[in-house]
């Protein structure tokens, strides 16, 4: 997969990066205080990765060697976890030495979906590196 800076959706050190699908209200906002971090931002699902469904966006902080996999989802949290895993599988070799973080931004999830056993296992495995944010 080509994670070259020229294909990034943002400049090298933007003040903020917004991951948002066209026509949707869900979005993930990352703030770059004082523009001190070198960032790259890619749309994965359907753009860089077309052979299977995966998470929507990848945000890379080259300064801290952190990679954020981002899924914007309505209500199917279990599917969102699978899409994060697929995104990681495709990006892992290109980002050796980077620590992965996982973000789900959802708008219609019910408590029992967030408490699903597959979601809990993922949360137990990644701890504080995994976050779900509900938007309304």
Functional labels for PLM-detected ranges:
Residues 71-78, 108:
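Short beta-strand-loop-alpha-helix junction that forms the active-site gateway
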Residues 95-101:
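Short conserved catalytic/interaction loops centered on acidic-Pro-aromatic/His motifs
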Residues 82-95:
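Histidine-anchored nucleotide/phosphate-binding helix
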Residues 1-36:
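Solvent-exposed, charged helical/coil patches
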């Amino acid at each position: 997969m080509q994670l070259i800076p020229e294909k990034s959706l943002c400049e090298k050190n933007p003040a903020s990066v917004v991951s948002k699908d066209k026509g949707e209200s869900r979005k993930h906002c990352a703030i770059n205080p004082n523009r001190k971090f070198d960032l790259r931002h890619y749309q994965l699902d359907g753009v860089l990765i077309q052979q299977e469904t995966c998470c929507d966006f990848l945000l890379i902080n080259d300064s801290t060697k952190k990679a954020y996999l981002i899924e914007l989802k309505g209500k199917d949290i279990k599917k969102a976890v699978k899409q994060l895993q697929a995104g990681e599988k495709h990006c892992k070799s290109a980002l050796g030495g980077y620590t992965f973080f996982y973000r789900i931004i959802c708008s219609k999830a019910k408590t029992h979906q967030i408490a699903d056993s597959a979601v809990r296992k993922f949360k137990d495995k990644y701890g504080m590196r995994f976050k779900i944010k509900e938007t309304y």
